[in-house]
Amino acid sequence: MELVVGRVAKSHGIKGELVVEVRTDEPEDRFAVGSVLRGRKPRESTLKSYTVEAARDHSGRLLLRLEGVSDRGDADALRGTLFVIDSSELEPSDDPDEFYDHELEGLKVVLTDGTEVGSVIEVLHSAAGELLSIRRTGETSGELLIPFVAAIVTSVSIADGVVMIEPPEGLLDPDFGDKSNSDNSNSDND
């Protein structure tokens, strides 16, 4: 399975440097000088190899210089390029509570009483933390976002293909927070 570890956001300067959005927990390894990256444009399948010539942090962003990319025009041509690895290249985690995103995608999500909620379609990474995007099953279809925290996600079994959750009251309610369904008996009508 192909996993994205970075995306070229834009060029930087006139000497061919690239601003890369990092999508890996190990950027110092993936983008080390001398590393060979495989990249492709979105919606294309042909991979091209790029060798990292230089890598540096600049204001919290990763800047890369690749062999053969020597000016702004070359760098602009790579805008949107996705750097990918094959999931078989990943080392297994030593931590039983640590998972790669692709390991969680597709797992069945159930409540602690066994009631099926849906399946994980994506792991979203935000400043506030990770969220599991769940495609609901049953009468209440649609997408559900569940914070990927121990207080809610009680267990994950890759072997069994199950994520068990114990959500707080209202989290699974599709009308939670919808003021149009609230009781209007306290209005100021005289």
UniProtKB/Swiss-Prot annotation:
**Which Gene Ontology terms of cellular component type are present?**
cytoplasm; ribosome
What family name appears in the similarity comment? Answer: Belongs to the RimM family.
Which Gene Ontology molecular function entries are recorded, alphabetically?
ribosome binding
What is the designated name of this protein?
Ribosome maturation factor RimM
Span list, region Disordered: 169-190
Gene that specifies this protein: rimM
Q: SUPFAM superfamilies attached here?
A: PRC-barrel domain, Translation proteins
> What is the annotated quaternary arrangement, including any partners?
Binds ribosomal protein uS19.
The protein's matches in NCBIfam families, at most eight in alphabetical order, are given as: 16S_RimM
Q: What does this protein do?
A: An accessory protein needed during the final step in the assembly of 30S ribosomal subunit, possibly for assembly of the head region. Essential for efficient processing of 16S rRNA. May be needed both before and after RbfA during the maturation of 16S rRNA. It has affinity for free ribosomal 30S subunits but not for 70S ribosomes.
Arranged from A to Z, the UniProt key words for this protein are: Chaperone, Cytoplasm, Ribosome biogenesis, rRNA processing
Origin: domain of life: Bacteria
Q: HAMAP family this protein is in?
A: Ribosome_mat_RimM
Domain PRC barrel: residue ranges: 95-171
Description of its domains:
The PRC barrel domain binds ribosomal protein uS19.
An individual GO BP term: ribosomal small subunit biogenesis
Predominant localisation class: cytoplasm
The places in or outside the cell where this protein is found are: Cytoplasm
